[in-house]
A protein has these predicted regions:
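Intrinsically disordered terminal and processing segments
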Residues: 1-67, 71-135
Length: 135
């Protein structure tokens, strides 16, 4: 085998090994992300116990992250502002903010096709409301 073929074979082998490692890291990151999303738990927040104010909450699962600002007045969510939403294809999940305001609860259905982002946004809103609870 001449030197040129040998060099090409070495380069191809090195690229293959690098690709396998990168693929492994990617699959691990996806697995960790899905485990974090599946581990999210939700509590129904009683709005009659949330003090009036503006509260910020966030949820970060590594790949999908959301940060929100919730304004509460007279035991109602007056507004929910999405300050940050890093996602893959989860932009449609942002529609749950309107559902939460309309229904005055965080217990809304996830958006089909954007389930993980829906859960992350929902948890961020729940965390914001929790900050307004006494004690």
């Amino acid at each position: 085998m001449n030197h040129r073929k040998k060099a090409v074979l070495i380069v191809i082998s090195a690229l293959l090994v690098i690709g396998l490692f990168a693929g492994g890291f990617y699959l691990k990151a996806i697995g960790d992300y899905k485990a974090k999303v599946n581990a999210l738990t939700f509590d129904e927040i009683d709005l009659t116990k949330v003090n009036d104010g503006i509260y910020e909450g966030q949820c970060d699962t590594g790949i999908v992250r959301a940060r929100v600002q919730v304004t509460v007045r007279d035991y109602r969510m007056e507004s929910i502002e999405l300050l940050e939403h890093e996602n893959g294809r989860g932009t449609p999940a942002e529609a749950i903010l309107d559902q939460m305001l309309q229904n005055q609860t965080t217990a809304v259905d996830a958006v089909s096709g954007a389930t993980c982002s829906s859960k992350v946004i929902r948890k961020a809103v729940e965390n914001a409301l929790s900050a307004g609870l006494p004690g």
